């Protein structure tokens, strides 16, 4: 795919194998010249990409840009030009206590329906635990009557939902809005730790509590609320609007988004959507400024399975190291051999740093100086900019570093029997500019050392069946390269400029919009072929409630102000996209 092409090409390498000794010295000098030239090209490209300002967009009916040189240009707030009395009344209703009260009831009702997904779920149709989605679908149909009356509603693989709001101009690429219906489980052991029961949907006067309230039934309900309101106001779209709601995002999405995306692809074709918005990064206070950081990329992903087979026997006559001991040694080596911090030239976090340097009053001076120097830094050198930025904590560190986490381990069946088979699973989130194959090669190298030390055979990603006295390495089927980076140009009208303008229209021009990157993966990983404009963004913002709403843990909740703002944003974005003329 074109989106996967790097902004900056790889540096040329010199050939250190020569047939004639007489030419070695000359070739070495030429290699040095090429390396210097490559660095010069790299400097120029980085300068052009991040320093040379984008031309201001001639926005016409939608708004204007700041006419100034900028490393992080901001668009003016974007307000739809087409207004009717009904739409004006809708906007007023969105600000009213009456709407807030009804919105509380809608989200609370959705939270009260248990839609947990589990790692060991079988196929749809075989595992009855999927049936929790039937009452959820009934609730949606009852709660949003206009949506179900006017939009085409289709079910994919039984529980996946696709809504089509047909536009009047079939030549325009559709807008796709996404969310997922499922939630992570609530362990029984944690039930007593909840302030309010996880399926209560309790509203305490400020926040709605319960599993899924912030991940991400709030986004799903907000999307449907915005469409319901627009229908009630008589809005008729010119550009088709699609809604796609998966049901197993929390367990990698294979049966949900993994079937929804091909369904949409078959109907519309490759690169057929103008924009995709799914759950993701949001709005927070950074370096003394309020910053919206829609995710324009995601890290890659691979799980490596390590299996060690060694002879069993009675525990009273053990070897120096059992299979568990050998596995422990290998895991220790894996965890000790960290991946380097590297801020690749196409990593969106680099753009976020430039936005901070330009617009944030509390941006660290040392980071700013390193940011200037980074324009001339070759990849071969230690990345001092990444190292300094990583001091902000692990959440920032792993935006620029491949992560390794040994998350699953098992082996041994009895206390007096030597373990014959031990298995561990190592999760990797792959940094921008790197590849899952790099992680496979790295673990293979460490496993080779351990296998040699203990006289074990090594089967390294070769699809070989396990054998006695061996270490076997394999990868789960789900291996993902880092996502293509969504364009963030505001030169002319673009998906990014419409998204940015919608954010600033709702929250004010003091909010800075900067590109973001996700350390985790969303359902969008199945949708890459449908659009180059994919944003992972949670548009709700409170200003008083911080953090991520306790997603995936006890006391998950979302403020009603955050939720209402999510509804406001989607109703605004749908209308702004309807007037956009870039695709």
Question: Model regions: which residues?
Answer:
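Short pre-catalytic strand/loop immediately N-terminal to key active-site residues, enriched for Gly-Thr
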Residues: 204-215, 514, 554-555
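Acidic/histidine-rich catalytic neighborhood of metal-dependent amide-processing enzymes
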Residues: 207, 212-293
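Sec-exported extracytoplasmic/periplasmic mature domains
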Residues: 108, 112-116, 141, 145, ...
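Loop/turn elements at helix/coil->beta-strand transitions in domains of secreted/extracellular proteins
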Residues: 171-174, 237-241, 271-274, 509-511, ...
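Solvent-exposed loop/turn segments at secondary-structure junctions
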Residues: 117-118, 170, 181-184, 248-252, ...
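Acidic/His- and Gly-rich active-site-bordering loop/insert found
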Residues: 23-26, 30-31, 47-211, 230-239
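Short beta-strand segments
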Residues: 178-180, 277-279, 538
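Metal-dependent amide/peptide-bond hydrolase catalytic core
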Residues: 2-39, 43-89, 98, 282-290, ...
């Amino acid at each position: 795919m074109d989106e996967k092409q790097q902004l900056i090409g790889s540096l040329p390498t010199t050939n250190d194998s020569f047939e004639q000794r007489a030419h070695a010295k000359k070739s070495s000098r030429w290699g040095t010249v090429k390396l210097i030239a490559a660095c010069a090209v790299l400097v120029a490209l980085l300068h052009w990409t991040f320093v040379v300002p984008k031309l201001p967009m001639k926005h016409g009916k939608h708004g204007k840009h700041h006419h100034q040189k900028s490393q992080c240009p901001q668009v003016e707030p974007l307000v739809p030009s087409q207004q009717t009395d009904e739409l004006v009344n809708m906007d007023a209703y969105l600000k009213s206590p009456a709407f807030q009260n009804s919105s509380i009831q809608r989200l609370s009702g959705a939270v009260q329906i248990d839609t947990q997904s589990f790692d060991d779920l079988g196929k749809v149709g075989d595992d009855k635990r999927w049936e929790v989605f039937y009452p959820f679908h009934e609730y949606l149909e009852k709660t949003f009557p206009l949506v179900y009356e006017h939009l085409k509603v289709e079910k994919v693989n039984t529980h996946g939902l696709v809504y089509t709001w047909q536009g009047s101009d079939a030549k325009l690429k559709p807008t796709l809005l996404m969310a997922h219906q499922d939630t992570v489980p609530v362990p029984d052991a944690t039930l007593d730790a909840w302030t309010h029961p996880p399926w209560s949907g309790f509203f305490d006067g400020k926040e709605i509590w319960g599993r899924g309230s912030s991940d991400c039934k709030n986004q799903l309900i907000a999307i449907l609320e915005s469409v319901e309101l627009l229908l009630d106001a008589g809005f008729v779209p010119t550009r088709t609007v699609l809604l796609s709601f998966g049901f197993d995002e929390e367990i990698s999405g294979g049966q949900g988004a993994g079937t929804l995306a091909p369904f949409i692809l078959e109907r519309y074709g490759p690169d057929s959507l103008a924009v995709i918005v799914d759950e993701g990064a949001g709005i927070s206070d950074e370096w003394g400024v309020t910053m919206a950081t829609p995710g324009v990329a995601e890290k890659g992903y691979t799980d490596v399975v390590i299996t060690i087979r060694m002879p069993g026997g009675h525990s009273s006559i053990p070897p120096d190291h059992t299979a568990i001991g050998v596995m422990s040694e290998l895991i220790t080596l894996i965890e000790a051999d960290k991946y380097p911090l590297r801020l690749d030239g196409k990593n969106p976090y680099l753009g976020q740093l430039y936005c901070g340097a330009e617009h944030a009053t509390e941006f660290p001076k040392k980071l700013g100086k390193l940011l200037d120097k980074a324009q001339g830094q070759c990849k071969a050198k230690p990345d001092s900019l990444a190292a300094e930025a990583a001091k902000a904590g692990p959440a920032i560190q792993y935006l620029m570093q491949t992560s390794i986490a040994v998350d699953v381990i098992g082996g041994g069946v009895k206390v007096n029997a030597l373990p014959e088979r031990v298995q561990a699973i190592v999760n990797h989130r792959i940094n921008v500019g790197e590849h899952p194959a790099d992680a496979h090669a790295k673990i293979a190298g460490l496993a080779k050392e351990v296998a040699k030390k203990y006289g074990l055979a090594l089967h390294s990603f070769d699809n070989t069946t396990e054998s006695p006295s061996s270490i076997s390495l394999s990868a789960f089927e789900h291996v993902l390269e880092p996502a293509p980076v969504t364009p963030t140009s505001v030169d002319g009208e673009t998906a990014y400029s419409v998204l940015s303008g919608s954010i600033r229209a709702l929250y004010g021009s003091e909010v800075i919009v900067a590109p973001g990157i996700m350390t985790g993966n969303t359902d969008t990983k199945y949708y890459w072929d449908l659009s180059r404009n994919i944003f992972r963004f949670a548009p709700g913002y409170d200003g008083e409630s911080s953090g991520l709403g306790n997603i995936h843990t006890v006391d998950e909740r979302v403020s009603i102000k955050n939720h209402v703002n999510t509804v406001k944003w989607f109703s605004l974005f749908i209308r702004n996209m309807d007037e956009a003329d870039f695709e």
